């Protein structure tokens, strides 16, 4: 029986999440206190989704959408390449907003508040929301040549610390309202934003389908205990799959929870169905 103590992988992931969140918050605080005059860029320049938003305008006429920079494009393209290699690991290891939602889930469990379970059918339907949000944002951004989503983005609202340095309810109430709703909702529904609304998550889920590395399940040793399903923060039915791709955030919690050694493992896209079962040639 596995220990209930956090694994080394779990601890490392939490430290990485905390480190990136701290970096963003410190950058936001320095910018809020000194501004660009002090040589500190805003958190807008550190957002990879900004690179995707401005990419069309940059390709068409060589200009950036206001508030985006070359750094956004570099981060955005780098993230896309990284996703083709490692799937949605950015969401599970790096994204500060994902880390915040994990923190809310941990708090809920500590307080012994029951999770609000979304029925499977509703979960599948709501999952398409990310793609609708993504399409709407890209259309509005291309049409207006403005960072249209910035006025509503809960990640930007929270981690830019605008509510601390530039609080203005009259002009920013939509962003504050959405952010509060997402925080409250994520307390009861694990990774609510990631699963149903995040446009960047929607983009990465599409690319994750062709990722080089992904979690695989050895069907010959699986005992169908479904502990992996319960452990998954985005509620993927891992026990029904031989290869986990699209919605996986790469947190590895399913592997850590599995009671049968090597039944769940990190494999590659080039493995054949036989290799997935026999585990011959696993990297």
Describe each PLM feature range.
Residues 1-231, 235-239, 246-247, 253-283:
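Non-ligating segments of multi-cofactor redox enzymes
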């Amino acid at each position: 029986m596995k220990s209930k103590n956090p694994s080394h992988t779990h601890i490392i992931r939490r430290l990485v999440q905390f480190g990136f969140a701290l970096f963003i918050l410190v950058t936001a605080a320095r910018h809020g206190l000194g501004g660009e005059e002090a040589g500190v860029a805003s958190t807008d320049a550190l957002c990879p989704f900004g690179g995707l938003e401005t990419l069309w305008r940059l390709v068409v006429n060589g200009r950036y959408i206001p508030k985006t920079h070359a750094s956004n494009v570099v981060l955005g393209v780098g993230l896309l390449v990284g996703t083709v290699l490692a799937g949605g690991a950015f969401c599970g290891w790096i994204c500060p907003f994902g880390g915040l939602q994990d923190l809310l889930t941990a708090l809920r469990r500590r307080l012994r508040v029951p999770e609000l379970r979304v029925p499977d059918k509703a979960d599948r339907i709501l999952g398409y929301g990310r793609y609708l949000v993504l399409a709407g944002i890209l259309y509005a951004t291309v049409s207006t040549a403005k960072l249209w989503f910035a006025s509503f983005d809960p990640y930007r609202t929270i981690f830019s610390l605008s509510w601390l340095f530039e609080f203005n309810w009259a002009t920013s109430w939509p962003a504050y309202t959405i952010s509060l709703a997402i925080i409250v909702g994520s307390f009861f529904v694990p990774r609510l934003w990631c699963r149903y609304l995040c446009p960047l998550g929607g983009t990465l889920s599409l690319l994750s389908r062709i990722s080089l590395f992904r979690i695989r399940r050895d069907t010959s040793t699986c005992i169908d205990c479904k502990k992996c399903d319960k452990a998954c923060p985005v509620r993927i039915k891992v026990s029904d799959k031989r290869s986990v791709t699209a919605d996986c955030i790469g947190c590895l919690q399913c592997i850590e929870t599995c009671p049968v050694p090597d039944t769940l493992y990190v494999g590659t896209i080039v493995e054949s169905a036989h290799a997935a079962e026999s585990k011959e040639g696993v990297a």
